[in-house]
């Protein structure tokens, strides 16, 4: 199994969705009752056809579109969740070779041509389409998704928010980073990358970090997110290739250690993150 889409992959997908904005919707295929649950076939189409997507938003790993209805009024929000390995594909006008891809970086363009793995699609009046390609069928499309339970976006969290939300708990540091109600968007690989770059133990109690250490953690977190977004995903991180048996730390050469923290498989430098 490849890495699950985390904040950087979802941000790349959100940027792809921007290619679909302000194009008139003429058809919606929402027949996949599992991917589009709890809606029935035709429910999503009924409110989107004739309208437009007007904005693409994201908080953490949650992504949604604002819409305009056929009569020009504000429409419902449309949630697009990538699941474990989903990908967004947006094609240009009919006859154009322009396509944009975002989401799971391990899905090849050849695979995305398989129509049976397109779980949801929107067709525009210019002949282009937006598709949710999801081989494993673990994504989700729904109207008015609930994002209120999510914490602040990990790429935008303020210094004071991180100090109180992450530092105010006796839980292991990695567990706090993974808690989407604390801050939204950090998954297993990104957490390991951030803690390795910050030289912090994943199992250290979060409330033992000093204010200076928490501020450093925020700087490193933002830097890792920015780098992963620019380079195509969390899998491009500096330590990710060393999350394996018999690997050594890319920085100091010490053996990489493996364990379970916060219920997730975790790798860290046995010397610098002890």
Residue ranges of model-derived segments:
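Structured catalytic/nucleic-acid-binding cores of DNA maintenance enzymes
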Residues: 1-274
């Amino acid at each position: 199994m490849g890495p699950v889409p985390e904040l950087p992959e979802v941000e790349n997908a959100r940027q792809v969705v921007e290619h679909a904005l302000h194009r008139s919707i003429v058809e919606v295929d929402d027949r996949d009752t599992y991917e589009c649950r709890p809606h029935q076939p035709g429910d999503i189409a009924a409110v989107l056809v004739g309208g437009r997507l007007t904005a693409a938003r994201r908080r953490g790993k949650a992504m949604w579109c604002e819409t305009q209805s056929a009569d020009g009024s504000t429409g419902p929000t449309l949630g697009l969740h990538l699941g474990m390995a989903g990908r967004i594909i947006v094609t240009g006008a009919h006859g154009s070779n322009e396509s944009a891809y975002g989401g799971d970086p391990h899905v090849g363009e050849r695979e995305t041509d398989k129509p049976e793995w397109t779980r949801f699609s929107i067709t525009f009046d210019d002949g282009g389409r937006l598709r949710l390609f999801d081989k494993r069928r673990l994504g989700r499309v729904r109207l008015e998704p609930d994002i209120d339970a999510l914490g602040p976006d990990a790429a935008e969290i303020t210094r004071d928010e991180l100090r109180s939300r992450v530092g105010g708990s006796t839980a292991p540091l990695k567990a706090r980073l993974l808690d989407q109600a604390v801050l939204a968007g950090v998954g297993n690989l990104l957490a390991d990358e951030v803690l390795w770059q910050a030289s912090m133990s994943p199992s250290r109690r979060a409330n033992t970090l000093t204010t200076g250490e928490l501020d450093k953690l925020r700087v490193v977190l933002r830097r890792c997110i920015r780098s992963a977004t620019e380079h195509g995903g969390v899998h491009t991180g500096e330590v990710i290739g060393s999350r394996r048996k018999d690997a050594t730390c890319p920085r100091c050469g010490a053996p990489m250690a493996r364990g379970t923290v916060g219920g997730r498989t975790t790798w860290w430098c046995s010397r610098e993150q002890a």
